[in-house]
């Protein structure tokens, strides 16, 4: 059983090292993880940093121009040979050194085509945390406004071979399109694990470009939902986790992130 972790980056010299360290220090890295990095021909020191680690660890990487983040992610899919794929892009990092191993039994069963967990979103300016959790069985109303966090979603490689990859004519919304198709249209087998997989730093284009997000979301909502689905959506309410649960998860996140930061500083 092999998990391919794919990191897409461009001009991320201040963020890429933390991401790499969270992967290569996984307790099962040597046995069960294939690491693939797709660099978009960075003009800063990103490629140099990647090479430093690729000289020490078995990292498969390329540095070449791409036409956007989803083009780069599709390149990562093609280069990967794992049974399951996880996208952990520059700046994001796995929550602790044993998180992949903790899911080994689920991966080895091969029962599910998609496995999704929770993630923590952190604002780098305020250091405030928000819980990113999803329903155990997300339905069409969920995908109308939200999506699965790719930093905490494992896709069977054969899913991409069967249904295709990310649509490359969008900048932000292709995650939403893919996940909606897989779970609502194609009804792939899926499993939610109620544990935190990763930390997502909210400073990427999807977090900061509200105008573009709104424009693409309108296209998505107009073109990827049937009239019947729209009726279902209007008839439902999205239930969010309780404030008490969110508060507890934020506290746990702070502790785990401090541990991860200490491990990175001490080379563990």
Segments the model singles out, each with a brief description of its role:
Residues 85:
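Short aromatic/hydrophobic "clamp" motif used to bind/position activated sugar donors
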Residues 63-80:
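Glycine-rich, basic loop-to-helix element that forms the pyrophosphate-binding segment
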Residues 45, 71, 92-106:
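Acidic donor-binding/catalytic loop of UDP-sugar-dependent glycosyltransferases
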Residues 131-220:
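Conserved nucleotide-sugar donor-binding catalytic segment
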Residues 38-48, 89:
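A conserved acidic beta->alpha catalytic loop
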Residues 12-26:
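Short, well-formed alpha-helical segments that are part of the catalytic scaffolds
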Residues 97-129:
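Conserved donor NDP-sugar-binding/catalytic core segment of glycosyltransferases
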């Amino acid at each position: 059983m092999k998990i391919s972790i794919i990191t897409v980056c461009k001009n991320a010299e201040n963020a890429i090292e933390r991401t790499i360290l969270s992967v290569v220090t996984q307790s099962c890295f040597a046995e069960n993880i294939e690491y693939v990095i797709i660099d978009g021909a960075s003009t800063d020191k990103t490629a140099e940093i990647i090479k430093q680690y690729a000289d020490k660890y078995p990292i498969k990487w390329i540095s070449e121009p791409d036409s956007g983040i989803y083009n780069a992610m599709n390149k990562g899919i093609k280069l990967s040979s794992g049974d399951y794929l996880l996208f952990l892009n520059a700046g994001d990092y796995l929550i602790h050194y044993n998180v992949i191993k903790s899911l080994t039994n689920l991966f080895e069963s091969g029962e599910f085509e998609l496995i999704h967990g929770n993630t923590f979103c952190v604002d780098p300016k305020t250091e405030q945390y928000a819980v990113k959790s999803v329903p155990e069985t997300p339905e069409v109303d969920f995908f109308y406004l939200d999506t699965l966090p790719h930093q905490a979603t494992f896709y069977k490689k054969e899913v991409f071979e069967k249904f295709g990859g990310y649509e490359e004519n969008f900048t932000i919304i292709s995650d939403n399109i893919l996940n909606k198709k897989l779970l609502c249209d194609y009804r792939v087998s899926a499993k939610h694990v109620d544990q935190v997989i990763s930390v997502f730093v909210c400073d990427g284009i999807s977090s900061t470009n509200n105008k573009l997000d709104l424009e693409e979301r309108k296209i998505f909502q107009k073109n990827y939902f049937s009239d019947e689905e729209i009726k279902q959506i209007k008839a439902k309410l999205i239930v969010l986790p309780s404030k008490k649960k969110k508060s507890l998860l934020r506290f746990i996140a702070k502790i785990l992130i401090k541990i991860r930061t200490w491990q990175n500083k001490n080379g563990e």
